C-alpha cells in the first residue's frame, strides 16, 4: 500500500480499537446496569435492549446506504460524535427510557461507522489486501474486547457510571485520527468503474437476501452472546456470578480471536468457504452445548467460549467476503448496509432470551440457538447457489 493509504488504514484500525474498548467496557454490563439502577426485571431489560438495538440497526442501514453518495470521512466523524454524545449522556439521566434512547443512538452510530469502514476498505484495497485487513481489523476489535471488559469490571466496582465516561473518552481520539489522516472522497460517483447508484438493486439480489437472512440468524447466536449469557446466568444464579461469567467469557472470546483470526481469515476463499463455514457451524453447536452444561464452573464456561469462538473466527470474515464478492463497485456501502440488517438478530436476542427464560425451561435457550445457527449455515449454501460462483474470482485470491 502507498504511504497515504497505509497511514489512513492504520488510523482507521486504531479508531476501531479505541471505540471497541469503550464498547467492551460498557455493553456487556448494560443488563447489570439497568438491573441495579432501575431495578428492571430480566424480561423488561430484554425488551429495552432489543428495542434500542433494532432502532440503531434500522437507522444505520439508511445512513449507510447514503454513504455511497457522499463523503465517507464526514460520515465517520459524525458517527463518532454521536457515539461520544450517547455515552456522555447515559450517566447524566435518571430515566430508563432516556437511557434506552441514548443506547439506540450509540448502536446506530457504531453501526454506521462499522459499515462505512468496511466500504472504505472494500473501495480502496486490492483483493489480496481486503481479506488480510478485514481479518486484522477484526483481530484488533477483539483486542479491544479483551481490554474493555476487565477495565469495565474494575470501574463498575467503584461506580456504575465510570465505564460510560471511559467510552466517551476513548472515542475522542478517533475524531483526531480521522480528521488528520483520512482524505475526503467524492462518494461512489468518483470511483472508476462504479456502477450507477441504485438501491433497488438490493431488493432484486437473491444472493444478498439469503446472506442477509443467514446473518440474521447467525448474529442472533453470536452477535449478542455476552448479554445473552449474562441474562441466562442472572436467572439461574445471581448478578454477582453473572459478572464473573462475563469477565471470563469475553476475554476468552477475544483472546481466541486475537490468536487465530488473522491466520484463518486471510486464507478464506471461494474455494474453501463451504467446508470452513461448515466447520464453524459445528464449533458454534459444540460451544452452545458446553454452555448448557457449564453450571457453576467458570472453567467450563471458558472452555465452551473458546470452542464457540472458533465458529466466530470463521463466520466473521466469511460473511464479509461473501458480501464483498457479490457487491458491484460503487455500491459497497449499500450492500454492507443491507447486510447489517442481519444484526437485527443480535438486536432481538435480548428480548427473545428474556421471553425464553421467562416462559420456557432454561436449557431450551441453547437448543433454540443451535437450531438457529444450523439454519444460518443452510442459508449460506442457498445464497452461494443463487448465482454463478467463481472459485477463481478475486475472492479466491484474497
Residue ranges and their predicted role:
Residues 1-6, 184-213, 398:
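Juxtamembrane intracellular "pre-TM" segments in multi-pass secondary transporters
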Residues 104-141:
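Cytoplasmic helix-loop-helix junction between adjacent transmembrane helices
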Residues 163-179, 366-382:
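Symmetry-related core transmembrane helices of the 12-TM Major Facilitator Superfamily/SLC fold
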